[in-house]
Every structure is written in C-alpha cells, then in structure tokens.
C-alpha cells in the first residue's frame, strides 16, 4: 500500500472461493487494531455459513461483524470515531452498496470490501466489478485449482459432485460441500458457450 495523504479511500479484495479473501480482510482489520484505529466489520445477513455474527475464513480465522440486510443499513452503525469500515461478501449486497462505499470513502473512512469478482459461471458478480473500478487499491487473489494445481481464478459450483448448469440460481451460500476453486481450463459450466 502507498502512503495516503488524505483520509478516505476504497480497497477491494477479490478472487475465487478459497483464495483467502476473508482471511486477507481479517488480516487488514487486525493490523488496524494494532494501530489503535477504530474499525467495524459488516457482512450480509445471508452469509450464515460459519457464524451469524462473525466473518470467518475457511481456515477458521474470525472477527466480529455486524450482519445487515440492506446496504444502506450500514450507515446506522457507523460513527465519527471510526477509521476503517470493512465489508465481507460484498457481492451479496444490493445495488446501493456502490453508493454506500463511495459516500463512506468521501467522508474520510478507509473502506475495505471483500468478495467474489465472478459468479460460478465465470461472469462478473454483482457490484464487485463497479467497486473494482472506483477503488484506489484492488487485490485480486487466486486459489489453487482442485483439478490440476494451476492458479485458480474461477469458482466451480457442484451439485451432487457434478458442475452446476449455467441457468442454475446465481446465489447459493455454501462452502467446500458446494464449491471448488478451478482454473480457466478446468472450470466447467454445462450449456455455456466456451
């Protein structure tokens, strides 16, 4: 990261599932705590895989979080003494999340968001591409392909061990029972043109 002379900016952490997005978000939050900065973490209510009131990485790291149903609910919890606002699983938030993040950064907060940049079909996911475009810093993480060991930038959804079809619902909250990291070449979506 570069030294910022002004307060208020946006950082995006993105990548496939199992690439370490939540782990990196937690790492950054812990660093702010060592610096005696005030941080608050948000997560969408829909994300209840490991905990309803924590952001939890796949390897078990966790940090307390405020679950919210709508993007604009974040404003109800932010106070002036906050320095850092973090939002995990940002792809699950409604379309207002881009405006919310912009407003917070413009008010002088360091805003860190983490989420999937592609859905299980390999297409841009939710508002993450817009957030990447307006961010001062973007960190794109990769996992390791569960099939061949190459860098994995895609998320493979599995249903009964088989790749999910292109027209299956976009949102299905799950972990290793439903998803695997895959590279471009091992990623499969039946009925999708290659």
Curated annotation (Swiss-Prot):
The record's section on PANTHER family has: THYMIDINE KINASE, THYMIDINE KINASE, CYTOSOLIC
What is the uppermost EC class here?
Answer: transferase
Protein family according to the UniProt entry:
Belongs to the thymidine kinase family.
Please give the positions of the paired cysteines in each disulfide bond.
Answer: none
- Record-annotated residues binding Zn(2+)? 145, 148, 183, 186
User: Which cellular component appears as one GO term in the record?
Assistant: cytosol
Q: Which gene codes for it?
A: tdk
Q: Which UniProt keywords apply?
A: ATP-binding, Cytoplasm, DNA synthesis, Kinase, Metal-binding, Nucleotide-binding, Transferase, Zinc
Source species of the chain: Bacillus mycoides (strain KBAB4) (Bacillus weihenstephanensis)
What name does this protein carry? Thymidine kinase
